[in-house]
């Protein structure tokens, strides 16, 4: 018997079924594996990406302006406090400012206490030509006139030396005003070589301890943080006005009159 030929539709259906059965197990595992790999790449973070994203230099760029702004803000605060009468200092700057204040106060006291003759001599001696002529005149008088008075400050005069010492005595202390030293011996010529040739070094005042430094009158510490201090000092003009008022009131009480108050003075003026 000859085999029967299958119809075309049956052959086409069989081919589609076989092709689907063969292709489905091959494609499905590929899709599943790609999905699992894709999910793994999404869920597991890689350490290389984290280290690459961090930029520590950007932190420095952000901190520098912050510190700069803080410094400007501190300077502004100190400027405002100084306008209101406060004083912002540190321990390093305090020594220099105290020396300047002491010099200013010393000059003020000298100017207030000096008399008219002293001021005239001071202004005359400011001129170098006058000072040289005066020194030459004093030197000539001391050389040609043995009876002329010679002071230790006179140019050309021998320095003062202590008197003769007893056998069991101790050497005297020779003080020149510029330096301190000890001179011993019974001969008057036994003097300091530096005094004779005017070679000396000025004595610098010893640095006092911080605790023994007296505070200036009217100084009040408002804030103290480490080396930074904020103090408030009264103006010297107010102190001088108070002193003048006290002196005027004292003079009036000495004369036997009671000082009148400002209210009484106004009433007397209106009357």
From Swiss-Prot:
It is found in: Cell membrane. Residues 24-57 are extracellular. Residues 155-165 have a biased composition (Pro residues). Residues 31-52 have a biased composition (Polar residues). One of its GO terms (biological process) is positive regulation of p38MAPK cascade. The chain crosses the membrane at residues 58-78. The modification Phosphoserine is found at residues 109, 114, 244, 247. Phosphorylated in vitro by OXSR1. It holds the Pfam family RELT. Residues 79-271 are cytoplasmic. It comes from the Eukaryota. Widely expressed. Expressed at highest levels in the placenta, skeletal muscle, spleen and testis. Residues 1-23 form the signal peptide. Residues 89-113 form a coiled coil. Residues 233-244 have a biased composition (Basic and acidic residues). PANTHER family: RELT-LIKE PROTEIN 1, RELT-LIKE PROTEIN 1-RELATED. Interacts with RELT, RELL2 and OXSR1. Interacts with PLSCR1. This is RELT-like protein 1.
């Amino acid at each position: 018997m000859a085999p029967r030929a299958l119809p075309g539709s049956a052959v086409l259906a069989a081919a589609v079924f076989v092709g689907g059965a063969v292709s489905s197990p091959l494609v499905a595992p590929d899709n599943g594996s790609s999905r699992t790999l894709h999910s793994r790449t999404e869920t597991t973070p890689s350490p290389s990406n984290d280290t690459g994203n961090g930029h520590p230099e950007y932190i420095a760029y952000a901190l520098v302006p912050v510190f700069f702004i803080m410094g400007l803000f501190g300077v502004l605060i100190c400027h405002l406090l100084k306008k209101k009468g406060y004083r912002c200092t540190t321990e390093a700057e305090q020594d220099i400012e105290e020396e300047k204040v002491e010099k200013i106060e010393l000059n003020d006291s000298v100017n207030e206490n000096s008399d008219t003759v002293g001021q005239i001599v001071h202004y005359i001696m400011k001129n170098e030509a006058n000072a040289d002529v005066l020194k030459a005149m004093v030197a000539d008088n001391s050389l040609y006139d043995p009876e002329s008075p010679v002071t230790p400050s006179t140019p050309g005069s021998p320095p003062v030396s202590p008197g003769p010492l007893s056998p069991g005595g101790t050497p005297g202390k020779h003080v020149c005003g510029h330096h301190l030293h000890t001179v011993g011996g019974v001969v008057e010529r036994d003097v300091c070589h530096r005094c004779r040739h005017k070679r000396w070094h000025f004595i610098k005042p010893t640095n006092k301890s911080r605790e023994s430094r007296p505070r200036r009158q009217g100084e009040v510490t408002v804030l103290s943080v480490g080396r930074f201090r904020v103090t408030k000092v009264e103006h010297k003009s107010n102190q001088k006005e108070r002193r003048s008022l006290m002196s005027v009131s004292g003079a009036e009480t000495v004369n036997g009159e009671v000082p009148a108050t400002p209210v009484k003075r106004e009433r007397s003026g209106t009357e």
